[in-house]
Amino acid sequence: MNTGIIDLFDNHVDSIPTILPHQLATLDYLVRTIIDENRSVLLFHIMGSGKTIIALLFALIASRFKKVHILVPNINILKIFNYNMGVAMNLFNDEFIAENIFIHSTTSFYSLNYNDNVINYNGLSRYNNSIFIVDEAHNIFGNNTGELMTVIKNKNKIPFLLLSGSPITNTPNTLGHIIDLMSEETIDFGEIISRGKKVIQTLLNERGVNVLKDLLKGRISYYEMPDKDLPTIRYHGRKFLDTRVVYCHMSKLQERDYMITRRQLCYHEMFDKNMYNVSMAVLGQLNLMNNLDTLFQEQDKELYPNLKINNGVLYGEELVTLNISSKFKYFINRIQTLNGKHFIYFSNSTYGGLVIKYIMLSNGYSEYNGSQGTNPHMINGKPKTFAIVTSKMKSSLEDLLDVYNSPENDDGSQLMFLFSSNIMSESYTLKEVRHIWFMTIPDTFSQYNQILGRSIRKFSYVDISEPVNVYLLAAVYSDFNDEVTSLNDYTQDELINVLPFDIKKLLYLKFKTKETNRIYSILQEMSETYSLPPHPSIVKVLLGELVRQFFYNNSRIKYNDAKLLKMVTSVIKNKEDARNYIDDIVNGHFFVSNKVFDKSLLYKYENDIITVPFRLSYEPFVWGVNFRKEYNVVSSP
């Protein structure tokens, strides 16, 4: 990161369309390392710091020299990248070749490069003289995409830009794959990773630390956004190590079926989906079925005396008394007195989706664009609504998030409760969420942070003085009240095995976190920083941001204004060239956002430079406006 670029900005205004100083400083580093030196980079920027815009700005610059292939996890994130590409183009004040940029989902990329599940090696020549940008890079390994990336790296000898807010998912194995992909050498995992009998005993050994420092030297960019522009986080529940957890004591009914499931079905309890299910809610015989879809077709099948299922529909008094779920009993009781929007994470999409829907409906909460709840709760004269997001409803996710994030929904009057499975753990942004709930314990520390990072990020809150509430729910035995204050108290298996599943899961998470934090601190220390004049390839982009910042505070200045000239000459040292640049932006009517006039264009008026507000107007028959800095096309019948 070029800290000299950050020093050019003073009191940067973030509330307008903008490129942040750290993004420009990182862009300089990427151009020098990937384009000039042909070396791969790991962009390890913590969630919410704007990795996507950095990557797309870099793609626009790189398109002048090479083809750029951007790989994203799924079609929904591809839509986000396509939208953000438009944002990046509008902020980009230089030439680029759009035809050289290709954005693929992993599915389409697989189809493009495999024939009958075999890599089409002859077709890989299309990636010669290319650069690959991989979003959520920690997720591509252990599948065909990771295999293909390794083949392309070895065959085509091209650099990669790997984006990740959490380069370690479950164990250091992921980091080992990243090192292998970024370096010119083949990594022997047996030499750098030590393995014990348990997953939590998978560690990066001293040899691995040395390999990491040696092979990735100069290839790491670490950044974490300052939290000064974020709301405070208020964790609820009792103290649990370095966080807080809400103990939800199970009823005798739930505890009985919980223990039956644990004894009969869970040979490897920490990884068994059945324990996720019964920790959320018990459903009698449903807990004993490996194929839930089969039982969902049953007609009026009794699960408990006061709970039945009919063609996949749950009904009965138990959905209100909630002896089947200590977590939902706490949740339903708590939300009645809370204001604002809720984001609720759960991992068991099929089972959890069924439980959530009918508990919410039975307790007076209506399904968004669906069934109305019993005796519905109201807000502003409208029912309080919920939606459940799983991988099965990808097609409507974008529209749903538009409603959830709209300013009109800041109070949750359009959509108050958003339940989501793992599909929402990465890449999406949620606005004005005041309550974050964990109905199931995440598998990894990185996943936990990613879920929080969907909401708690820069620009997601208008009022940062109001805290965000986090509820990490754990189903525990009716008599369980242990204080968990130190991991050292739980080093023996016999002490851990008697704990409730959720508590074991949390301890497991914390054990892995120790190793994750150790490696992250090494990566942070390796992050490349320097102070140099800006790279020639980013000069116009940098000047564009400086001009936007200048004219936010200045509506009218003299054409030969000394402050403007000084600002431009901080980048373009030659005064004549600096004056020519000022002529170009004024005669080209550069777009700015002014604090008085809002969206404006620069004009020369007599001996002054003025900001002239504008707006797009159109006749009723116009059905499409494509507005970019290069052109303005109006399409009509």
Swiss-Prot record:
PROSITE patterns: DEAH_ATP_HELICASE, HELICASE_ATP_BIND_1, HELICASE_CTER. ATP binds at residues 45-52. One of its GO terms (cellular component) is virion component. Keywords: Activator, ATP-binding, DNA-binding, Helicase, Hydrolase, Nucleotide-binding, Transcription, Transcription regulation, Virion. Residues 32-185 form the Helicase ATP-binding domain. Disulfide bonds: none annotated. Belongs to the helicase family. VETF subfamily. Acts with RNA polymerase to initiate transcription from early gene promoters. Is recruited by the RPO-associated protein of 94 kDa RAP94/OPG109 to form the early transcription complex, which also contains the core RNA polymerase. ETF heterodimer binds to early gene promoters. This is Early transcription factor 70 kDa subunit.
